[in-house]
């Protein structure tokens, strides 16, 4: 039986962040966990399916391999989902937020660090910038570690061990026959308390600041693509690891080209005499202009493909084409003299209409047959 798409299993889109993937798995885990559905084989299968999808999509290397090669990429490179050792420690991270830290005792009762939040930044590019790549400087409002206390939150000293939980960050509670652990209400799971708060950050360990970052944009990037800057998100609380910054790309519309995959498309207007007699014209591309030969009797809607004048693919390196769509323009604002010449020309065409305008003649014949057959 073929495996379902991991994104479909979790109900997230291709650009879902790690936090969104984790949130989706939490929802499914609450619904299908075997402890909540004893004896339900279908729920057990769905839980395992969701757990497998979560394992891959929350691992940046496995996810990149899956995005490029599908299930085969994960199986061939990492020995399949589950080979990385998805254990109960991972489930403790997931279920700790669901069931009020009941599962946190499985991790040895240690205080859990509160990682910094991930940030998102929308970067707007021109088509030329997206196709050729560049480095762009961005400014991101964020939280950084306080420089005065180095993120500890304590003024001129180190935080003290919490007297309530003795530094574990957890309190063991007895509910009938069930013994569970909950986050310490005094230190909020840190295992430490601050007796003399830092005056610069008021004991928070963090300060707000606008960071200036240089982002390298690879050639071939497109709307919807994301660039992950590891560790450039918000600083974690009290020295915990920082989050990541996700740069979301949006490419502005271009007046001459629109992109479909690695191909570029462009409408090329020509007058009706060039369409009838043929000619040559300069065609703009993103790498300069090229000469395009218009053969005689070219019809509107005709497409000319200029090989290798499209976009170089972000991952494979293959180069797309520029596809020129011919639009035959009807002349407007004609003078009386010009109209007379066109009428004379039209009379000449009627003498051999089947040869000069075969599609028009065939259309009229079809219309005539349609009405006479009624």
Curated annotation (Swiss-Prot):
The highest taxon in the source lineage is Bacteria
Where is the J domain positioned along the sequence? Answer: 5-70
**Chief subcellular site?**
cytoplasm
Q: Which GO terms describe its biological process?
A: chaperone cofactor-dependent protein refolding; DNA replication; protein refolding; response to heat
Detail which positions bind Zn(2+) 2.
162, 165, 184, 187
Q: Which Pfam families match?
A: DnaJ (PF00226), DnaJ_C (PF01556), DnaJ_CXXCXGXG (PF00684)
InterPro entries xref list: DnaJ, DnaJ_C, DnaJ_domain, DnaJ_domain_CS, HSP40/DnaJ_pept-bd, HSP_DnaJ_Cys-rich_dom, HSP_DnaJ_Cys-rich_dom_sf, J_dom_sf
One GO MF annotation is: ATP binding
Q: Which keywords fit this entry according to its UniProt record? A: Chaperone, Cytoplasm, DNA replication, Metal-binding, Repeat, Stress response, Zinc, Zinc-finger
| Spans of repeat CXXCXGXG motif | 146-153, 162-169, 184-191, 198-205
Q: Positions of the zinc fingers (CR-type)?
A: 133-210
**A cellular component term, taken from the record's GO annotations:** cytoplasm
- UniProt: Zn(2+) 1 binding residues: 146, 149, 198, 201
Q: Which cofactor does it need?
A: Zn(2+)
Q: Where in the cell is it found?
A: Cytoplasm
* Cofactor note (record): Binds 2 Zn(2+) ions per monomer.
Give the UniProt family note.
Belongs to the DnaJ family.
Please explain the role this protein plays, according to its UniProt record: Participates actively in the response to hyperosmotic and heat shock by preventing the aggregation of stress-denatured proteins and by disaggregating proteins, also in an autonomous, DnaK-independent fashion. Unfolded proteins bind initially to DnaJ; upon interaction with the DnaJ-bound protein, DnaK hydrolyzes its bound ATP, resulting in the formation of a stable complex. GrpE releases ADP from DnaK; ATP binding to DnaK triggers the release of the substrate protein, thus completing the reaction cycle.
- Print the domain comment field: The J domain is necessary and sufficient to stimulate DnaK ATPase activity. Zinc center 1 plays an important role in the autonomous, DnaK-independent chaperone activity of DnaJ. Zinc center 2 is essential for interaction with DnaK and for DnaJ activity.
Complex and partners = Homodimer.
Protein name as annotated: Chaperone protein DnaJ
């Amino acid at each position: 039986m073929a495996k379902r798409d991991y994104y479909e299993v979790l109900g997230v889109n291709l650009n879902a962040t790690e936090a969104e993937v984790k949130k989706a798995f939490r929802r499914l885990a609450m619904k299908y966990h075997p402890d909540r559905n004893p004896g339900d084989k279908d729920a057990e299968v769905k839980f395992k399916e969701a757990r497998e999808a979560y394992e891959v999509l929350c691992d940046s290397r496995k996810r990149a391999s899956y995005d490029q090669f599908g299930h085969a990429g994960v199986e061939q490179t990492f020995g399949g989902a589950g080979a990385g050792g998805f254990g109960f420690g991972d489930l403790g991270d997931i279920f700790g937020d669901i069931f009020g830290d009941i599962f946190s005792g499985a991790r040895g009762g240690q205080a859990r660090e509160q990682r910094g939040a991930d940030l998102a930044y929308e970067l707007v590019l021109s088509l030329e910038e997206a196709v050729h790549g560049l480095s762009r400087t961005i400014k991101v409002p964020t939280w950084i570690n306080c420089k005065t206390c180095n993120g500890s939150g304590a003024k001129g000293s180190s935080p003290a061990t919490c007297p309530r939980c003795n530094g574990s960050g957890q309190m063991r509670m007895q509910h009938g026959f069930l013994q569970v652990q909950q986050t310490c209400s005094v230190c909020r799971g840190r295992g430490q308390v601050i007796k003399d708060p830092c005056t610069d950050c008021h004991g928070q360990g963090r300060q707000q600041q606008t960071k200036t970052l240089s982002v390298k944009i690879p050639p071939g990037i497109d709307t919807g693509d994301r660039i992950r800057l590891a560790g450039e998100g918000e600083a974690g609380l009290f020295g915990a690891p920082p989050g990541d910054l996700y740069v979301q790309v949006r490419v502005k519309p271009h007046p001459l080209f629109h992109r479909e995959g690695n191909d570029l498309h462009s409408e090329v207007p020509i007058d009706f005499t060039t369409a009838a007699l043929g000619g040559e014209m300069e065609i703009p591309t993103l790498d300069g202009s090229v000469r395009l030969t218009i053969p005689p009797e070219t019809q509107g809607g005709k497409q000319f493909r200029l090989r290798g004048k499209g976009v170089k693919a972000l991952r494979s390196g293959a180069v797309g084409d520029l596809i020129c769509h011919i639009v035959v323009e009807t002349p407007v604002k004609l003078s009386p003299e010009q109209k007379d010449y066109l009428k004379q020309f039209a009379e000449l065409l009627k003498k051999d209409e089947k040869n000069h305008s075969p599609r028009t003649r065939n259309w009229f014949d079809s219309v005539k047959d349609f009405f006479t057959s009624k």
